[in-house]
């Protein structure tokens, strides 16, 4: 198995990213797909694109995908409150999402105080070394949803994670999500105005979390997210 990652940017501003884990015979088509995504993206044409291919030498940890909850009227405040995220922490998370800084990874905040707990600056924390396996083989999930669900499932695979809020920084995509192990994966429609680049990924955690161990799991442990509906 091989890990394939793509990142593209323009003048050091993030444009697009993608990754997966695949067999050797799928490398060529995956690289072509990531190349197309990186170079022909609505956020603009990059002046830098990097594709990294690395053989997986460790056992791959299987993670059960979060359940997708279909609720057109999902309310972010109610969802976060149900998961133990305070209003103060949510407001601080939205401040990071709406500021002008384009973060390339997630920001980890205390679910109680909203204080930032990681020290990775604009880089943030990156959930990497993962793939998504749809056991249903129905093809009913598009690439955007499978990528989001895979990341959300990895991020929430820890008992001290209260939940994750994600708002895409793509110009015309205005749907975000809130996800947690407790309540599943909820899409949030019209969470931002169209034609805006603001966005981000916020992870709300219990202050007792072993941050170094958690970050190592997200960034270094090979993971396969398995999606299967009943």
Curated annotation (Swiss-Prot):
Biochemical pathway: Metabolic intermediate metabolism; pimeloyl-CoA biosynthesis; pimeloyl-CoA from pimelate: step 1/1
Summary of subunit composition and partner proteins: Homodimer.
This protein's name: 6-carboxyhexanoate--CoA ligase
Cofactor(s) needed for function: Mg(2+)
Pfam families found in the cross-reference section: BioW
NCBIfam families in alphabetical order: PRK01322.1 (NF002360)
HAMAP family: BioW (MF_00668)
GO molecular function, one term: ATP binding
Enzyme's top EC category: ligase
Protein purpose: Catalyzes the transformation of pimelate into pimeloyl-CoA with concomitant hydrolysis of ATP to AMP.
Superkingdom assignment: Bacteria
EC number: 6.2.1.14
Recorded family membership: Belongs to the BioW family.
Keywords tagged on the record: ATP-binding, Biotin biosynthesis, Ligase, Magnesium, Nucleotide-binding
Catalytic activity: heptanedioate + ATP + CoA = 6-carboxyhexanoyl-CoA + AMP + diphosphate
GO terms (BP aspect): biotin biosynthetic process
